[in-house]
From Swiss-Prot:
Protein known as: ATP-dependent Clp protease ATP-binding subunit ClpX
GO molecular function, a single term: protein dimerization activity
GO cellular component: HslUV protease complex
Subunit comment: Component of the ClpX-ClpP complex. Forms a hexameric ring that, in the presence of ATP, binds to fourteen ClpP subunits assembled into a disk-like structure with a central cavity, resembling the structure of eukaryotic proteasomes.
Organism from which the protein derives: Baumannia cicadellinicola subsp. Homalodisca coagulata
Binding-site residues for Zn(2+), renumbered to this chain: 15, 18, 37, 40
Thylakoid listed as a keyword: no
Keywords, in A-Z order: ATP-binding, Chaperone, Metal-binding, Nucleotide-binding, Zinc
Residues reported to bind ATP: 120-127
Pfam families: AAA_2 (PF07724), ClpB_D2-small (PF10431), zf-C4_ClpX (PF06689)
Disulfide bond residue pairs: none
GO BP term, example: cell division
Domain of life: Bacteria
Annotated CDD domains: RecA-like_ClpX
């Protein structure tokens, strides 16, 4: 009689939390006088994960590296551009300090410190922004301004930038709101003349207008799956006032605009003095004298310039700087390829003359640091193709002739082990 009673009670086991019976769930875990189903376990896990996210989010704001710490980290990955790194370090520190300040009870409202980077191709603009984001452990995304159009026209809406940022943090809105957005080629959306256009300029001034609110700070409605907005779909609300926007561009010809202004103001002043140096030195020095009115003359609208209060200029990299980039940073190009060859059990060596030749080639191409990888990849292509099929290779040596005369790298073989055990 007792055994029969026990058997009947087993048939009526149910979850102590949701009251679902055993046959209604996939798994029911029983404990002393209590049971829990797999659905409730998953729900508890979700609740705990959200709590942990909130704790991590709050602790990240509390622990803020100083401008010195930020600059020192940038030095590990970015060669040269000392003034730009210092400007960025202070601006980034002030931005995240402002976010922390917003949580305190103070009536003083701090403005955003969005950043405009001006410098030639391959000078390190994108690398600076990416390195900052990785150091601060915040989401980072990069957008190309030339692909953006006004809402309603063929192309990408500016809100797609936020969608890309959300993707980087698994659609965690709170985390995305502490992220960094880098908009490249911002100079390419300048209007064609100083006067406002009476026709639609959907990829120039129109994009600047579309970006205004986004950069300044607004609550944007972002489609969860990207693309165009539809009235039927739900939107994610993203507060962009907490997102740091960094815009960058080469601004070819801006030095001439600055020079004309300075010549008009004082023909025997700074502009006349720097003409005594080299052309590149002139351009670098002129860019450091940039004023908002110069950017307006170039084609950016005043309202857009006002949203980018911090301006940092980057110099064109010298041959010496390119050589340092090849070997000094923690993720230097030569170190990356040496690690790649080590996976094959082979040592890769670059002679000093080879590094100089690579730098000279990049200077001739006028591609800056960006062109270094394509040069190194080109000279190592055949070796990397053949190496996995070759036996007993001990070392590969890249000398100057490999770069300048397209000769094959020197390969040193180890003695085969012929000992019979």
């Amino acid at each position: 009689m007792t055994d029969k009673h026990k058997d009947s009670s087993k048939q009526f086991l149910y979850c102590s939390f949701c009251s679902k019976k055993q046959h209604e769930v996939r798994k029911l875990i029983a404990g002393p006088s209590v049971c829990i189903c797999d659905e409730c376990v998953n729900l508890c896990n979700d609740i705990i994960r959200e709590e942990i996210k909130d704790v991590v989010k709050n602790s990240d704001i509390q622990i803020l590296p100083t401008p010195h710490d930020i600059n020192n980290h940038l030095n590990n990955y970015v060669i040269g551009q000392e003034q730009a790194k210092k400007v960025l370090a202070v601006a980034v520190y002030n931005h995240y300090k402002r976010l922390h300040h917003d949580t305190s009870h103070n009536n003083v409202e701090l403005g955003k410190s969005n950043i405009l980077l001006i410098g030639p191709t391959g000078s390190g603009k994108t690398l600076l922004a990416d390195t900052l984001a990785r150091f601060l452990h915040v989401p980072f995304t990069m957008a190309d301004a030339t692909t953006l159009t006004e809402a309603g026209y063929v192309g990408e809406d500016v809100e797609n930038i936020l969608h890309q940022l959300l993707q980087k943090c698994d659609y965690n809105v709170q985390k995305a709101q502490h992220g960094i957005v880098y908009i490249d080629e911002i100079d390419k959306i300048s209007r064609k003349s100083d006067n406002p256009s009476i026709t639609r300029d959907v990829s120039g001034e129109g994009v600047q207008q579309a970006l205004l609110k986004l950069i300044e700070g607004t609550v944007a409605a972002v489609p969860p799956h990207g693309g165009r907005k539809h009235p039927q779909q739900d939107f994610l609300k993203v507060d962009t006032s907490k997102i740091l926007f960094i815009c960058g561009g080469a601004f070819d010809g801006l030095d001439k605009v600055i020079e004309r202004r300075m010549d008009t103001n004082n023909s025997i002043g700074f502009s006349a003095i720097i003409k005594l140096g080299s052309d590149q030195l002139n351009e670098d020095k002129l860019l450091t004298q940039v004023e908002p009115e110069d950017l307006v003359k170039f084609g950016l609208i005043p309202e857009f310039i006002g949203r980018l209060p911090v301006v940092a200029t980057l110099n064109e990299l010298s041959e010496e700087a390119l050589i340092r980039i090849l070997r000094e940073p923690k993720n230097a190009l030569t170190k990356q390829y040496q690690a790649l060859f080590n996976l094959e059990g082979v040592e890769l060596e670059f002679s000093e003359e080879a590094l100089i030749a690579i730098a000279k080639k990049a200077m001739a191409r006028k591609t800056g640091a960006r062109g270094l990888r394509s040069i190194v990849e080109g000279i190592l292509l055949e070796t990397m193709y053949e190496l996995p099929s070759q036996l007993h290779v001990e070392k590969v040596i890249i000398n100057e002739a490999v770069i300048t005369s397209n000769t094959k790298p020197k390969i040193i073989y180890r003695e085969p082990d012929n000992k019979v055990s």
